[in-house]
A protein has these predicted regions:
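Nucleotidyltransferase catalytic core that binds NTPs
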Residues: 1-144
């Protein structure tokens, strides 16, 4: 029986940290199922993605280490996903350490090391001054 791993994420502004954690998760078993947060679920969490769900889903699905992509539409779906996909290991980045321990009654729970110094938040923060400068230049141009 294949050992199935399940992980969740938004995967906005896809970067090497995303790839590495998905590769680490896949190395735990034979099959990796990835739940990508939908735009509507992100809105409920107070987050807005730069890249729309359909594109993020397709990017993740194109990776060699990923076997199946499903939508993440609620906090409550995790137990059903574990059951529906016959999951043996639930894996998340160590920034979520302890938050999913309650799933241990359904499968093994693992927290994986993240790639240091890279995150979508860091990328957004680094791009913000450029965005503001560009917006100011466009505004000046329009006002003439």
């Amino acid at each position: 029986m294949p050992r199935t791993i399940l992980t969740y994420g938004t995967f906005d502004l896809f970067h090497i940290g995303h790839l590495r954690i998905l590769e680490r998760a896949r190395a735990l078993g034979d099959r990796l199922v990835v739940a990508v947060s939908t735009d509507s679920f992100n809105a409920l969490k107070g987050k807005k993605s730069v890249i729309p769900f359909e594109h993020r889903r397709d990017i993740v699905a194109a990776l060699r280490c990923v076997d199946l992509v499903i939508p993440e539409e609620s906090w409550e779906q995790k137990v059903d996903d574990i059951r529906n996909h016959d999951v043996q290991v639930f894996a998340m980045g160590d920034d979520w350490e302890g938050r999913f321990d309650f799933l241990a009654e359904h499968c093994e729970v693992r927290y994986l090391a993240r790639t240091p110094e890279i995150s979508s938040t860091v990328i957004r923060t680094d791009l913000e001054p450029e965005r503001r400068d560009h917006l100011a230049a466009v505004t000046r141009e329009v006002k003439g």
